[in-house]
């Protein structure tokens, strides 16, 4: 496959350092508030990317961190707990990390290889800072804070394509007290009264954001690893500064081979932000729509482009999900009606080939979704009408190809339905079949309505009837 690499500004052939193993790191949330649909877009994209690689036979080690101590967390704790904040601040990240896992499960995001937390890795971060000071890339300020000296790193700005001289000129501010340069950034922040703190050789305090991710990613994945990702808003300064730290610490130009970034999410043409009051939480969306519909809505936009979020888009996606399930349910039932030999040639190989071709081209999920949807409609309009002319092996092969495509996008995840509901629907289908054979159509229509009350829709294909059961949640 070929993927766009922000580091080179080119679509490149994707290869891994170790054949058959893909190691990746995605910057996780700072858990100080509700997880929103912008977050969801990033983590669903990398879940699809992971599923695609797994479908090609890769083992994928995907690491997602939690920045569980930060200025925003401290501010939230003070807002909620007042003078008790210094004791109770951990309640804030714990609450929103739990919410992250809750919505991830409802979005069918597969568990990561590891979920490191900043607070569990402070000792490692202190060791890194000591090494950077010793190497001459960092310095200690009078208050005990430690800053990374950007000017000591060759080619700073390589990821964001910015020159250090232009960045300094653009800053238009005097350096903060203790800083040598306005672009220098904190590796260690000195403690202030009422804040959480950890011991260090310089002063009580806590690690800086940019250091945290590079320490945790390389700890779990080694150096170099295959891909590093996140939202496009992290390119500068966060990812730029990660590269600078790793370059100073390891002496490597780039500690990750591919840098993959997901575009902004907009609402009515404006970037989603708290200041505009247009933030939409994942809990809100998932209270009204299925996780599969939201996944599909994300996939209907190319990952690198801005995505305009709307509930109309989710309505459209939910309708597509319904069609995908109809094709799956009814084709699954049709296996029993297939014969021993093929009397016609029918398959969905062309849809599957086009699906994978789209993903091979910079992960074009909009085209892949079109192919999956086209395959579903072909199954309903053509395959189900010809089941009696196909062998069981052929029908099973079509079903397997269809499910393989759906699994990459992360839909048809609710294939299992309540056994008692399915048995009740099957019984109604059998009763209705007898009524139709006896031409008691009014009674047959009544039975159809009873099935509908159970959440099932019945579709007739000549003498055969197949059903699909509506999924909830």
Swiss-Prot record:
Zn(2+) binds at residues 27, 213, 238, 242. Keywords: Aminoacyl-tRNA synthetase, ATP-binding, Cytoplasm, Ligase, Metal-binding, Nucleotide-binding, Protein biosynthesis, Zinc. Gene3D superfamilies: Cysteine-tRNA ligase, C-terminal anti-codon recognition domain, HUPs. The keyword Ligase applies. CDD domains: CysRS_core (cd00672). It is found in: Cytoplasm. Its cofactor is Zn(2+). Pfam families: DALR_2, tRNA-synt_1e. GO terms for biological process: cysteinyl-tRNA aminoacylation. ATP binds at residue 274. Binds 1 zinc ion per subunit. Its EC number is 6.1.1.16. It catalyses: tRNA(Cys) + L-cysteine + ATP = L-cysteinyl-tRNA(Cys) + AMP + diphosphate. A motif ('KMSKS' region) lies at residues 271-275. It is an enzyme of class 6 (ligase). The keyword ATP-binding applies. A motif ('HIGH' region) lies at residues 29-39. PANTHER family: CYSTEINE--TRNA LIGASE, CYTOPLASMIC (PTHR10890:SF3), CYSTEINYL-TRNA SYNTHETASE (PTHR10890). Belongs to the class-I aminoacyl-tRNA synthetase family. This is Cysteine--tRNA ligase. The lineage of its organism: Archaea, Thermoproteota, Thermoprotei, Thermoproteales, Thermoproteaceae.
